[in-house]
């Protein structure tokens, strides 16, 4: 027993030292990013293309549309298509102009004056593969000013979106800086969660070899990693490293589901300490159903029979049920 206590104290000291160093690095990184010199980047230079659109959807035409206020009559389903028309502004002065267009699990086609200049996802959709979600940067020429632009968005999954984010005309050289400035807190948080979680999981794994009761620490680490990875994917940090959209989207949904499992496993000891038969049985049913869902959904995802984005509503149901259960558990415990 004395040997085990000595081991725990030694490892505990190492954990504290590692986390203290990591926390210091995090604070310095956060301070650097938040207060960094960004004088050369000006978001005001961007031209938001939100007004004056013509939209064709579900056989209906809408003119002089402001995309900020526009909502589709129903949520886009698999195979649904929306077409948007407008003119490229004449007053931009960019050296390397691009139009930033966000999409959610959709095929994208962009034409300028009837000439196709950009396409994404058509081949993957034809093969029933995951297309993915993210930002697209469509290059345009200075001579394209004033020309007509047509955007065709085709949904590849069930229940993808019901509103359309306004495209943005901007300078390509500002893309990276603007992404970092706008999302710097999220990015630092995501990276920190992943690093902290990985360290905790590794240390907990080592400690579990010598002593019991370290599983909660392991699941804290797992939850930290999944939340950090989901954040990085959801806010498009992965695109900074040119990771393909299908990979980013797959990681986003996998970590969303595994995060729910990690949280459930963390509370396992609390559930059994109550010695409440009903709560224990409900916990077993929930974890069992979630585990089956993970196996089935991941199998469907990687065999391209059915993709995780189409199961988002089911995932949300699991998360809501888990939150309700955890609230009841905490109330019952205290």
Model-found features: residue ranges?
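Juxtamembrane segments at transmembrane-helix boundaries
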Residues: 191-334
């Amino acid at each position: 027993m004395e040997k085990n206590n000595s081991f725990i104290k030694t490892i505990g000291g190492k954990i504290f030292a590692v986390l203290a160093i990591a926390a210091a690095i995090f604070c310095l990184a956060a301070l650097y990013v938040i207060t960094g010199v960004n004088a050369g980047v000006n978001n005001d230079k961007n031209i938001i293309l939100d007004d004056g659109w013509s939209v064709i959807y579900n056989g209906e035409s809408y003119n002089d549309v402001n995309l900020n206020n526009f909502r589709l009559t129903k949520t886009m389903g698999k195979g649904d298509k929306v077409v948007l028309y407008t003119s490229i502004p004449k007053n931009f002065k960019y050296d390397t102009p691009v139009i930033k267009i966000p999409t959610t699990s959709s095929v994208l086609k962009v034409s300028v004056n009837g000439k196709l200049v950009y396409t994404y996802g058509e081949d993957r959709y034809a093969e029933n593969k995951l297309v993915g979600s993210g930002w697209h940067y469509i290059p345009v020429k200075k001579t394209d000013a004033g020309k007509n632009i047509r955007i065709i968005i085709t949904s590849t999954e069930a229940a993808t979106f019901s509103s359309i984010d306004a495209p943005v005309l901007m300078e390509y050289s500002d893309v990276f800086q603007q992404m970092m400035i706008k999302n710097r807190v999220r990015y630092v948080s995501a990276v920190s969660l992943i690093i902290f979680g990985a360290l905790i999981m590794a240390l907990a794994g080592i400690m579990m070899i010598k002593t019991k009761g370290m599983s909660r620490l392991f699941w804290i680490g797992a939850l930290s990693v999944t939340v950090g990875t989901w954040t990085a994917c959801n806010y498009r940090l992965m695109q900074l490293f040119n990771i393909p959209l299908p990979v980013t989207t797959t990681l986003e949904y996998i970590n969303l589901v595994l995060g729910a499992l990690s949280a459930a496993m963390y509370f396992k000891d609390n559930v059994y300490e109550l010695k409440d038969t009903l709560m224990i049985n409900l916990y077993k049913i929930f974890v069992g159903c979630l585990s089956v869902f993970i196996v089935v959904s991941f199998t469907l995802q990687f065999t391209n029979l059915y993709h995780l984005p189409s199961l988002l509503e089911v995932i949300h149901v699991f998360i809501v049920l888990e939150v309700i259960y955890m609230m009841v558990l905490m109330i019952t415990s205290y």
